[in-house]
């Protein structure tokens, strides 16, 4: 997504580029490490002028049946509009059979609660679903998701309801 955004002239700031995280020495427990990581990420997000947060995740469920994308949105202005637009684009292109809808995110999710900017959390699919897990690991599918996320962002910024791609 970062590379595609750059090709379109959209500046992006990554809050994390790998699973490797540098923790302060004082963070000795898992909870302290997670808090430290979350705090550093939210400071970076909230320091950006006119930011839009797109938090990308893969879902997991105890059973293999659930599938499809889902977009959750925060409270700041524009979050619902971006969330609904992104969800519409993802489901129409990748999982048209999905009955999921974009929804407000739980207040329990610190990153989304503390973000002061337009913010969405995108669940790209279920790693617990064997077919989706295979798809989610392919470059082609990752590129499709990235293109749809960027198109949704560009549509949102342009104030358009039509598909950009």
What are the residue ranges of the model-derived segments?
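Active-site-proximal helix/loop segments of hydrolytic enzymes
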Residues: 1-165
């Amino acid at each position: 997504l970062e590379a595609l955004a750059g090709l379109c002239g959209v500046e992006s700031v990554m809050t994390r580029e790998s699973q490797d995280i540098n923790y302060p020495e004082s963070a000795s427990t898992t909870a302290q490490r997670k808090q430290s990581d979350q705090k550093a990420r939210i400071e970076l997000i909230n320091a950006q002028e006119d930011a839009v947060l797109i938090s990308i995740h893969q879902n997991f469920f105890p059973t293999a049946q659930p599938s499809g994308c889902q977009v959750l949105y925060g409270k700041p202005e524009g979050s619902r509009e971006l969330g609904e637009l992104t969800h519409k684009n993802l489901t129409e292109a990748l999982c048209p059979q999905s009955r999921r809808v974009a929804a407000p995110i739980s207040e329990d999710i610190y990153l989304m609660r503390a973000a002061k900017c337009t913010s969405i959390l995108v669940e790209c699919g279920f790693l617990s679903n064997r077919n989706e897990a295979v798809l989610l690991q392919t470059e082609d599918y990752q590129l499709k998701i990235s293109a749809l996320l960027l198109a949704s962002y560009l549509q949102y910024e342009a104030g358009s309801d039509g598909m950009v791609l």
